[in-house]
Amino acid sequence: MAKGKRFLVLTTDAFGGHGGIALYNRDLLLALCNFPGCSEVVAVPRSIPGPLEDERPNNLTYVTTGLHGKVKYVMAVLKVLRENPDFEFIVCGHINLLPIAHLVGVWLRKPILLFVYGIDVWQPSKRKLINKLIKNIAHFVSISEITKERFTKWAKLSDKKGSIIPNAIHMENYGAGDKNSRLISQYGLDGKTVLMTLGRLSADERYKGFDEIIELLPELIREISGIVYMIIGSGGDRERLQKKAMLLGVGGHVVFTGFVSESEKPDYYRLADAYVMPSYGEGFGFVFLEALACGIPVVASNIDGGREAVRHGKLGALVDPHDAEDIKKGILKALKQPRMIPEDLEYFSYSNFEQRVHRLVTEFAKD
């Protein structure tokens, strides 16, 4: 009997993590576990921010001893290699993990498959070693065309050395529906027109467009008096955004919810009349898929990965994030759209994601 294939995945986070990259990594691990002939996937996460409540595949070994520092992470990887070094290839789940992935690749004499996401690879790394090691990867996977283009340009990689596998949306976890009456009461949204953006409130992620929507509110209020901007997420930039809203006289029209769990997200998305994120540094924009899967019209940027999430305007409105008037037009257009889940969202289904991963793995796991 032929032995099963084993894959080693070095990743930032997946199960127990939050955000688009963690969700992507979960789907990637599931797809690898479902690859025909796969006997085991060994994943070593760098962090596990939340509880490990998600159900995991039986053939996934999720190593939890590499948390809390680089030394512990390296030791966890070494322990995996000592126990059984027989892997088909190494998946490097983030460019910052490339140094350790490179060492493992040299030791095992196996190829490295690097996954890249967004602004983290749009320009050279501040760590010169990482920039040097990029030429040694066998292949890379980007979640979007724009990230692939920017990465190959500065890294001087052949276009053929990269593939695109966008995020997946698990439609069964979402669905269209009425606004949740409890949440309407909790946030005082009865009779309000709700715009929404979800994301980490960090100085490093101001490119998501929170400021642009707040600055546009005075003008929007003149046209729609009951309009409210709901910002979902937590982070150190919240206080600055709150002060900005107050200074502009729209403090009463901006609602900050704080952190919202994955299980609560669908009910929150359904509160929106339009999901708006005029970003200028988003690698893809998984939140657009989530909003669309809840039947919410969306407004995305025409200059970053958001345009790919809405399939270049097929699934939602595209606007110039640096043009306030264009953003306003996009919002007003979205507010006139019916609440419905577009059929073309199936393009991003998990089954299609898994097929894309399996086609890629076939090239790296040949007998």
Protein language model features and the residues they cover:
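Conserved acidic donor-binding segment of nucleotide-sugar-dependent glycosyltransferases
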Residues: 312-313, 317-324, 333-336
